[in-house]
Amino acid sequence: GVPCLCDSDGPSVRGNSLSGIIWLFGCPSGWHNCRDHGPTIGWCCKK
């Protein structure tokens, strides 16, 4: 999957690890949405 920035990772992608994965059709079972705003396409989810 494509990594994405969770709210807990920090305000920007620079110098922060991307702990989320982008899912186009919502987070799968056992995962949760870890970003309140964005991404534009899909959901940023993590286990």
UniProtKB/Swiss-Prot annotation:
Record keywords, A-Z: Cardiotoxin, Disulfide bond, Ion channel impairing toxin, Nematocyst, Neurotoxin, Secreted, Toxin, Voltage-gated sodium channel impairing toxin
Subcellular location: Secreted; Nematocyst
GO CC terms in record: extracellular region; nematocyst
Annotated SUPFAM superfamilies: Defensin-like
Disulfide-bonded cysteines: C4-C44, C6-C34, C27-C45
Broad class of the protein's primary localization: secreted
Gene Ontology MF, one: toxin activity
Pfam families attached to this UniProt entry: Toxin_4
GO biological process: regulation of signal transduction
Family under the similarity heading: Belongs to the sea anemone sodium channel inhibitory toxin family. Type I subfamily.
Annotated function: Binds specifically to voltage-gated sodium channels (Nav) (site 3), thereby delaying their inactivation during signal transduction. Thus it may strongly stimulate mammalian cardiac muscle contraction.
This protein's name: Delta-actitoxin-Axm1f
Organism: Anthopleura xanthogrammica
Source taxonomy: Eukaryota, Metazoa, Cnidaria, Anthozoa, Hexacorallia
